[in-house]
């Protein structure tokens, strides 16, 4: 497979994946495929999809479900949601969280346009009316700081937790009682693109990289 993954590759990644997956992935990709030249763009799903349609990107990493007509997609991994809360919060004593316990909580989420926001609400079976949306942030790091200051709770994807988004805060993480409170991360490219085999190879590489980090 050494003749695959050579030349230039333009990869788009959404902001709730890029900062947490790319740093270690890029180093290992460079070591394994030194002839691969990567150009990276981080943006919201809708913009990345447009760049992909227009041929400005070769493939994109994003979260499903997301409507992608004319594109081939492959699933990479499930990214579990965890509830993040500050010490002393009334949900702290719960070993695991039932989705119904989120109703009426002060919930901190990303602003409109970030698909993580919709995926988190959907995965937790929450309507906007069920929650008290007290703050809309621009990044997961911002949300973590707001929780640390006692302003509410938030939902964090496992990939961000593995990449130590909590830093040196004393925040608590709780799993949900229900299985599959998660989003699905995948790759997408144009159906007409002849490099399908390379993209499937890259998908395997990313999958392995993420699994290795989560088992560390």
What spans do the regions from the language model cover?
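Hydrophobic hinge/microswitch elements
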Residues: 44-49, 53-57, 62-63, 113-171
């Amino acid at each position: 497979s050494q003749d695959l993954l050579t030349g230039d590759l333009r990869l788009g990644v959404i902001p709730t994946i890029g900062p947490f997956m790319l740093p270690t992935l890029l180093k290992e990709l460079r070591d394994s495929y030194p002839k691969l030249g990567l150009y990276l763009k981080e943006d919201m799903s809708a913009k990345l999809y447009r760049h992909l349609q227009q041929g400005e990107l070769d493939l994109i990493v994003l979260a499903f479900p997301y409507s992608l007509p004319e594109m081939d997609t492959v699933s990479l991994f499930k990214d579990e949601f965890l509830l993040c809360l500050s010490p002393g919060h009334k949900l702290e004593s719960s070993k695991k969280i039932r989705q119904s316990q989120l109703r009426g909580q002060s919930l901190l989420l990303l602003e409109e346009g970030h698909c993580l926001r919709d995926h988190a609400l959907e995965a937790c079976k929450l309507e906007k009316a069920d929650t008290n949306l007290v703050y809309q942030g621009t990044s997961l790091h911002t949300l973590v700081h707001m929780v640390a200051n006692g302003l509410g709770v938030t939902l964090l994807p496992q990939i961000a937790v593995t990449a130590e988004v909590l830093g040196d805060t004393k925040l608590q993480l709780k799993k949900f009682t229900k299985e599959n409170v998660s989003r699905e991360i995948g790759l997408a490219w144009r159906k007409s693109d002849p490099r399908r085999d390379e993209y499937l190879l890259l998908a395997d590489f990313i999958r392995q990289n993420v699994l290795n980090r989560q088992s560390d």
